[in-house]
Amino acid sequence: MLKISLENIGKKFKNEWIFRNLSFEFSRNEPIAIIGPNGSGKSTLMQALAGAIPINEGKITYSNQEKTIPDENWHELLSFSAPYLELIEEFTLAESVNFHVKFKPFQNGLSTSDFLQIIELEKHKDKPVKNFSSGMRQKLKLGLAFYSQTEVLLLDEPTSNLDQKGFDWYISQVEKAIKNKIVIVSSNEPKEYIFCEKHLNILDFKIKA
Ligand SMILES: Nc1ncnc2c1ncn2[C@@H]1O[C@H](COP(=O)(O)OP(=O)(O)OP(=O)(O)O)[C@@H](O)[C@H]1O
């Protein structure tokens, strides 16, 4: 079973430590909320977990049955949804999905049309993403993350821009995902991580001068 272990990790920008001496372990069936005020370093930690930015100290290890997975293979295992990750604006919805599945196939042989029904956007399949509303974009990003055949789900501000119906959809989807994946939610909004019993508060890993 996949695990992600953090051993005394630290990240700084210029001279400012964003977090330091952070040790933690993530595993399946134990969703974790990364919490802390605006600007505390939640997104920075999420990006470090994804291997998208380097850390300055310590070690992040992905391992399966004690076998270490090389850094360059982490991306195959993870799905990441975040407001700052871009969609390809020129593509239609159907083109976006077909492009995505070339790199990250859907789990359980799900078809594009089934997927479009699940994200409740089938009637917009030929619309360019550049004409999508913010909530439609968010459902597309979340849907791709939930339904790709990956084992780690990184969700940064998952319900931003979602209305109540979209929020309820998110909760039902994430509850399914928890059973099969390592789920990590970064958030300022308690109701979007209500299913997380354990919290990682970035403020606990700030350096006291
Ligand atoms: N590339 C960068 N270069 C320099 N400083 C950065 C960089 N990225 C982030 N920071 C700084 O790191 C700190 C943490 O930012 P981060 O975006 O991780 O916070 P956050 O907890 O996700 O905030 P929010 O809740 O507002 O989304 C901030 O002070 C930010 O300005």
Regions inferred by a protein language model and the residue ranges of each:
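Conserved structural motif at the start of ABC-family nucleotide-binding domains
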Residues: I4, F19-N21
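Q-loop/switch helix immediately C-terminal to the Walker
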Residues: Y84, E89-P105
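Catalytic Walker B motif of ABC-type/P-loop ATPase nucleotide-binding domains
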Residues: L153-E157
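Conserved ABC ATPase "signature" region
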Residues: G109-K125
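Conserved ABC transporter NBD signature motif
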Residues: I55-W74
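Helix-to-loop junction immediately C-terminal to a conserved catalytic motif
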Residues: A50
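The feature captures the beta-strand-to-loop junction immediately N-terminal to the Walker
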Residues: I35-P37
